[in-house]
A protein has these predicted regions:
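Solvent-exposed polar/charged
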Residues: 31, 62, 133, 159, ...
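Active-site phosphate/pyrophosphate- and oxyanion-stabilizing loops and adjacent acidic/basic residues
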Residues: 58, 155, 182-183
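Structured loop/turn residues at beta-strand edges in well-structured enzyme cores
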Residues: 64, 89, 137, 187-190
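Residue-level recognition of oxygen-bearing side chains
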Residues: 77, 153-156, 190
């Protein structure tokens, strides 16, 4: 459990990403529903000084030492936003892992890109050799998913992306709390 109140994987889950919720989470959801305000912005006079999204963003920033954190509706939306911000569009190839949540692939397709599978390693994440083997002249980005609480081997991936001028987008939705050489995953990419 994080000091600010959100829970990482504990005895209630078999692995990160499979957490179950209990009485604490039910109470928190009901408190939000009782305000009648489900949106991040506005309705200041009605929210009874509850700023759940803003507080969660601050908590994530503090925990990961990130400069910014912005809550969106889902991991799918987060990946779609990152691809759009990276300028991924029609015909751009994006290297993705074959072991991932379907939203990884859907987000690339939504952006107009073409997902290209690359091999994963024992961490269940992409690795540099798998990425390199899948590269073509149309490759514009690598969408790296840190799976099941594991951090990918980032140094060789970062080096490859720099050498090939590839945008690196990290999906750390299944690995909040995972670190690589003292840095939170999700903070290495674009």
């Amino acid at each position: 459990s994080h000091p600010a109140g959100f829970h990482l994987c504990d005895e209630r889950c078999a692995m990160p990403g499979t957490e179950r919720f209990g009485d604490d989470e039910r109470r928190e959801v009901m408190e939000v529903l009782e305000t009648g305000i489900l949106f991040r912005y506005g309705h200041d006079d009605l929210r009874r000084d509850r700023w759940n999204a803003r507080d969660m963003e601050a908590c994530v920033r503090d925990y990961t030492d990130a400069d910014y954190a912005l809550a969106v509706s889902s991991g799918s939306t987060a990946v779609a936003c990152a691809l759009a911000a990276a300028g991924i569009g029609h015909g751009d190839e994006v290297i993705v892992p074959p072991f991932t949540y379907l939203a990884t692939i859907e987000a690339v397709l939504l952006a107009g890109g073409l997902p290209v599978f690359a091999e994963i390693d024992d961490t269940l994440c992409l690795d540099a050799s798998g990425i390199e083997a899948a590269l073509t002249p149309e490759t514009k980005a690598v969408l790296l998913v840190h799976m099941c609480g594991a951090a990918a081997d980032m140094d060789p991936i970062l080096e490859l992306c720099r050498e090939r001028d590839l945008v690196l987008i990290e999906d750390a939705g299944q690995a909040l709390g995972a670190w690589y050489h003292g840095r939170s995953v999700g903070l290495f990419g674009a």
